[in-house]
Amino acid sequence: MKNVLILGAGGQIARHVINQLADKQTIKQTLFARQPAKIHKPYPTNKMQTTSGKKVIQDR
């Protein structure tokens, strides 16, 4: 299984990429967005993980 990080996951281009990759059985996506509430749903959550910019900064 390949891991794919999508930066700017709340944007329009990312929405298209996420939808195309969601059909692939061999890809696990990590969606990164400054505001995770803007990530368009529904997406299958068993192959996706979301994280925000605030969390990354706080973990330092």
UniProtKB/Swiss-Prot annotation:
Residues 40-60 are annotated as: Disordered. Gene3D superfamilies: NAD(P)-binding Rossmann-like Domain. Missing about 170 C-terminal residues compared to orthologs. This is Protein YmjC. It comes from Escherichia coli (strain K12). The gene is ymjC.
